[in-house]
Amino acid sequence: MNKYLTVKRIEFAVTYLCNARCRHCYSIHSEGAFPAHIDKSLALEIVRKVGRKYKLESIMTFGGEPLLFPEIVCVIHKEAASVGIPLREVITNGYWSNNSGRIKEIAKNLAESGVNSIIISVDAFHQEHVPLDIIRKTAEACLQARIEDVSWDPCWVISEDDDNRYNRKTKFILKELEDLPIRNSGGNMMEPEGLALVNLKEFLPPRKKIPAGKCGDIPYTEPLDSIKCVCVEPDGRIAVCNDFYIGNASKTDIVDLIESYDPFKIPEMKAIIENGMKGLIDWARTKGVEPDPEGYYSICQMCTNIRKSKQKLK
């Protein structure tokens, strides 16, 4: 067992294609950088090998909109159930079809493949593109298919308690759906990434030369020397954090990638572990990269931007 990477969860970015274009979307920039969807056979192999080798607690499929490719999603979760992964999640915008029969068919197939958690994004942003009556039909179909846990997952701006036009709209939408026996997950906060940097600047925090925080403090991050979750990209690359890739499972066995992971052998990771964002800046300067003089909204944005600037110098 690798002391730096003890896999408890695996996530699949099935696709970065989407049938919406939400104004806050963080993943839209990935749409043209990857194949249309992950290879089904590769995904199956990864789930089988990782599920048999490690005691995984959960698996998730997401996107983009993963249910643009329901067959792939179902194959992934059927194998996950077969190897004993207990929590099998799909996060979706709920826009599977305009046809009620097709929506019910997809929900039935998801249930039969072993999906036991459906997380539906509902908020002011998604409902600019996804009709509420479709969301209702999707949620009802999931309940009828007896999927164990169905939840709403709203995105809040600044905080759930902040009184702004987007949060007010989100609360109105949730009110419209409250007759359904579906829990609210509590949701997440809008991240200063992707389209939010263009469309929602007025709601972003002030930029700082070195934003506060460290890996593990920020949602969806972990200390780089104590990773519990890996993400599989549509091209097979394996990420331990945003754009931090440790190899490609289509070229190297997934178990070998996991077992050989050593963040102290990756200079930028080593710098972050030992000295945080200041360490990353010092490392970047040795490579001829200067941080943005205007600063950054978050440590994640800072880390990603600096590493991408370094890659452009190659």
Protein language model features and the residues they cover:
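Conserved alpha-helical substructure of the radical SAM core
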Residues: 1-92, 97-105
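A general structural motif
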Residues: 7-9, 54-56, 85-87, 113-117, ...
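Flexible mid-to-C-terminal extensions adjoining Fe-S/redox cofactors in radical SAM and related proteins
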Residues: 243-314
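Residue-level signal for mature regions of secreted extracellular proteins and peptides
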Residues: 11, 15-18, 234, 293-296
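N-terminal [4Fe-4S]-dependent radical SAM core
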Residues: 1-11, 209, 280-286
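Short cysteine clusters
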Residues: 18, 22-25, 236, 241, ...
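Short, flexible loop/turn elements at secondary-structure junctions
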Residues: 16, 65, 94, 124, ...
